Amino acid sequence: MKKVIAIVCAALLLLSMAACSSSAKKDKYVVGVCQLVPHEALDAATNGFCDALKEALGEENVEIKIEVAAGDSNTCAPIVNAFVADKVDLIMANATPALQAAAAATADIPILGTSVTEYGVALGIENFSGTVGGNISGTSDLAPLDQQADMITEWCPDAKAVGLLYCSAEANSKYQVDTVQAYLEAKGLSCTQYAFADSNDLAAVAQAAADASDVIYVPTDNTAAAATGVIDGVCRPAGVPVIAGEVGICSGCGIATLSISYYDLGYATGKMAAKVLTGEADISTMPVGYAEKVTPMYNAEICADLGLTPLDGYEPIA
């Protein structure tokens, strides 16, 4: 009788262990992607994320719901709230306003950001150490700001007045222009910030910047990236060169940039997501990742129109 009881107990123990093992891994994961606006950089990041996630988990084992806020940061909140209501397994927030909305929506569902420049600024974390903690981590698209500032003096050595053009609704854009301004002013250049609220007043603000500046700096800024034609339509006819924070902006209105690969950035985020979903990594201790490589690039067409000779070490934008 004791042997029978022992066998039954052992069998129950094995069944219990099997149940625990099966609950650790799901048959299919559901991931919600909130992307702020459709443009080259963010699209590439989303594509890289999806590719990495499908490769790591198997395409049949993951459902990815992609929602785009069409450039309206207020639309991010209902998108991520719907993901929370649907009890998705993970949220990927593509751009700072998407990350801020996701962070406000849930403290339980894992959140990975990408195309976010500075997490401490975006989330209001003082003395940011590189790890957000809680349910948030991700990747940053920050290219070295001191090197971007140096590009301004390298490409426009005679410039005295620098205009810093950015969207006031994007906290990370303000962080970038403040940092670049401090660096340039230490070199003796005069800097003026030109903030536009949204795409509706961009043309007027860009015109004011072009009228008073020898060169304009546009940081990594989602609103600017979605409206480069407006900036180019003002600055190129005025003969004012634009140094851009990322390649998407540069291809539309800039002469040069220090660029990262947004596809690779999104891909790295997707690999992080797979580890979080399978329990291989703890998101609360996962440090924010950064691009491994930055590439100096130039816009051949705009350089030619402005009579500028590309500098050595810069690659043409394809």
Regions found by a protein language model. Give the residues of each.
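Pocket-lining segment of extracytoplasmic ligand-binding domains
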Residues: 171-240, 246
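Extracytoplasmic "Venus flytrap"
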Residues: 30-50, 65-76, 169-173, 221-226
